[in-house]
């Protein structure tokens, strides 16, 4: 929580929110996190669900990368459904690079 400014994140995300149909799945995932960080879990759930749908249809994503992304994004969706926001554990970046997440 000390590493982020959720109000500013939501301000910046407004442009993206207005263009939700034009966004790709990573952008939708980011908007969902900004919404959740500001307590708007219902809309965070909507954006994360749309992100998962678009990610599943991404033909440029390999099967392995799709499975890993689905796992991470579904976990975030579960948090939003339980009124919890998502904070990246920066140690997870090394795990993702190593293919363990």
Write out the residue ranges for each language-model feature.
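Short helix-adjacent coil turns
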Residues: 4, 39-40
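"A position-specific structural signal for the A-helix of alpha-solenoid helical repeats
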Residues: 30, 34-37, 73-76
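A short alpha/beta connector and helix-capping loop motif
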Residues: 36, 50-51
């Amino acid at each position: 929580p000390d590493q982020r400014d959720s109000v500013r994140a939501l301000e910046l995300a407004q442009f993206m929110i207005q263009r939700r149909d034009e966004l790709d799945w990573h952008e939708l995932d980011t908007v969902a996190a900004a919404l959740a960080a500001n307590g708007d879990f219902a809309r965070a759930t909507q954006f994360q669900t749309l992100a998962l749908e678009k990610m599943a249809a991404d033909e440029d994503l390999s099967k392995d990368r799709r499975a890993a992304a689905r796992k991470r994004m579904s976990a975030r969706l579960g948090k939003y459904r339980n009124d919890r926001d998502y904070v990246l554990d920066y140690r997870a970046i090394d795990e993702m690079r190593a293919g363990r997440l």
